[in-house]
């Protein structure tokens, strides 16, 4: 409801009527419904990744395979394509099919200035892009997103995380020179060693200039 007050909202769901009954009285002129089957709720991970290419809005549609084939993703992997076929996006938006490359939105973090932050644990997972080495992954991402550099975190995890250490649960850019991150100060906690190592890695990162 708070989002609708500020932005137009796209809702993908199996049953529009059920969602309307939960939302109640809102400004539905700001809501776009698209009914389709889904597996889960994580639009950040299965949804298209948007960029501007010489001022033209582009949506990359990567493969979503349920966080490394842990969960069913047969419906979620089709959502972005179905949205395009259903004329959901503006006419100037260009869809680009990025198959067979597997990539979730939550596995990468950008400062918007040419630097991308990610984790080795996730992107190098054998259940995603199993035949690509880290250098090949880096070259591919730099080419696709027009990056100057990629910062790889080798440490950091959260218990119960099924994503293989998505960076969006560990560290996020606040600006091009500031990163907020998860910290653990309890030496008895199972996360202490890994998050301390991650903190040291982050301290070694420098600005591009």
Where do the language-model regions lie?
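The feature marks the mature, well-folded catalytic cores of soluble enzymes
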Residues: 1-209
């Amino acid at each position: 409801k708070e989002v609708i007050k500020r932005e137009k909202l796209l809702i993908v769901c199996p049953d529009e009527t059920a969602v309307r009954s939960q939302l109640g009285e809102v400004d539905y002129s700001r809501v776009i419904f698209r009914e389709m089957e889904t597996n889960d709720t994580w639009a950040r991970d299965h949804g298209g990744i948007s960029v501007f290419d010489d001022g033209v809005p582009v949506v990359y549609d990567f493969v979503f395979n349920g966080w490394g084939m842990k969960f069913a993703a047969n419906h979620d992997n089709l959502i972005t394509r179905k949205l395009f076929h259903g004329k959901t996006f503006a006419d100037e938006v260009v869809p680009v099919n990025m198959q067979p490359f597997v990539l979730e939105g939550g596995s990468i973090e950008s400062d918007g200035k040419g630097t991308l932050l990610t984790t080795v644990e996730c992107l190098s997972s054998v259940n995603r892009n199993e035949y690509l080495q880290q250098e090949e992954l880096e070259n591919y991402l730099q080419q696709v997103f027009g990056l100057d550099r990629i910062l790889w975190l080798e440490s950091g995890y959260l218990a119960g995380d099924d994503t293989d250490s998505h960076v969006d649960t560990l560290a996020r850019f606040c600006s091009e020179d500031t990163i907020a991150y998860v910290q653990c100060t309890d030496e008895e906690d199972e996360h202490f060693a890994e998050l301390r190592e991650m903190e040291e890695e982050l301290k070694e990162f420098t600005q591009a200039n």
